[in-house]
Amino acid sequence: MLLFPLYGLGTQFLVLPTDAEELSIGSHPTMSGISSVNPALFSASLNHPGLSISRGIWLGDVTLTHLGYTQPAKGKIFHFNAKYSGLSDLEFRDAVPLDDALSTFSSYGVSMNSGFSMQGEKQKFGISFSYIFMGLYTEKSSGFGLNLGYARDIFKGMKLGITIQNLGIMSKLSKDTPSLPTRMIGGVSKQIIFNDYRNTIYCSGEWNQSASTGKFYFGNNFRWDRLSLMGGFSASENVVASSAGFGLNLGQYEITYGIQFGSQNLGTPQILTFQFQLP
């Protein structure tokens, strides 16, 4: 029998972008928000709960869905995130070529995590715990992960951040045990404010246990009044990608769109994000 690779999406769905801002600028541990990659930098606007809903598509027509919620309480920011990535209409075929597949099936991954962040003098700490579930055809696996984060204001709008993600284990499939894509991201950012304009430059590097080489991210977020213009660039050994996006802040609501162009020619990732400031 010829089968789709056993892991399908695999646990790598855990490192896919969660919202339009991350897709547009990159995975930076100094970028705060409802869906920050750094558990230390989850934020809630004006001490109100925040809700984020994202929907998009990744390479190879993989669908992306993400829900984020943050709640300030007693000097801490508590957060909950749910993430789904799926690939449908995979074909099951014999070794003998046929016009029609014997059947179709899907591959998917689900992650739910919650935790909190707290602030000290010029620094923040964060932690979150994840429940992970993935499946392909009749195969299923589940497990738990731990995410840690730290951020520090250095001076004059410059920030340092580091996060370690996906420390944990998964249950065994029929033959093998999936491994989590443990990764560490470190980076710096610099914010420049001039009159009504605010520009933030990001630079980060990533080490991923499942990758043979590191990955570098460079991004920029320019804000003027209610408008945001974003751009980014990422590079690893064999893959180079550029990205862009824009956002519109309508007070209690914000809409953000991001798109990425890469050298793999496997599709054009896009994500649309809606954020709400709750009462």
Language-model segment annotations:
Residues 1-5:
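Sec-dependent N-terminal signal peptides
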Residues 6-279:
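Subset of outer-membrane beta-barrel
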